[in-house]
A protein has these predicted regions:
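Conformationally flexible catalytic loops at phosphate/diphosphate-handling active centers
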Residues: 164
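Thiamine diphosphate
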Residues: 7-157
Length: 164
């Protein structure tokens, strides 16, 4: 669950405070950000590297609570629809998939962009725009532009945590 260290520092007012630091990989930072943001559901279709996000949440103490519904889906479309349903109920959800999975979820994704959401909904797509380690080249940012939704591109683990 990442390496943890505790740092003690003195504030400008002279008070001593303790801050826990976690050293996380990018997928772990996304997962921890979702947990700390208070997600109610995480849904995914297995496919590396997006699988690690859901697995981290399932292993984490905070993510393994009855208040966090976590499921592997039959495909990316059903994963997106489950997360969208949680969002329609006013709660926060996360859905994770590989780049080719967004093709499968495209119908639900585009319709959600039109109808909107009521709670938070974060879609994490693990892209491979230069076909480094996958069977095809795809840049899912074009889906985001077409749907006119915000596209977040963290450049490090801290940004990934904060953006989620």
């Amino acid at each position: 669950m990442g390496n943890r260290t505790t740092t003690t520092f003195t504030t400008l007012t002279g008070e001593t405070e303790h801050m826990e630091k976690k050293l996380l990989l990018g997928a772990e930072a996304v997962a921890q950000g979702a947990i700390d943001a208070g997600i109610s559901g995480v849904y995914a279709y297995p496919g590396t590297p997006s699988t690690e996000i859901t697995e981290y949440i399932q292993r984490a103490t905070e993510g393994n609570q009855p208040s966090v519904h976590s499921r592997w889906a039959t495909n990316e479309k059903t994963a997106f629809e489950a997360a969208l349903g949680v969002s329609y109920s006013g709660r926060r959800s996360l859905v994770c998939m590989k780049h080719v999975g967004l093709n499968v979820a495209a119908d639900a994704f585009m319709n959600a962009a039109i109808t909107g959401v009521h709670g938070g909904l974060v879609l994490v797509v693990a892209d491979d725009p230069s076909m480094h380690s996958s069977q095809n080249e795809q840049d899912s940012r074009y889906y985001g532009r077409f749907a006119m939704i915000p596209i977040l591109e963290p450049s490090n683990q801290q940004e990934a945590y904060e953006m989620v």
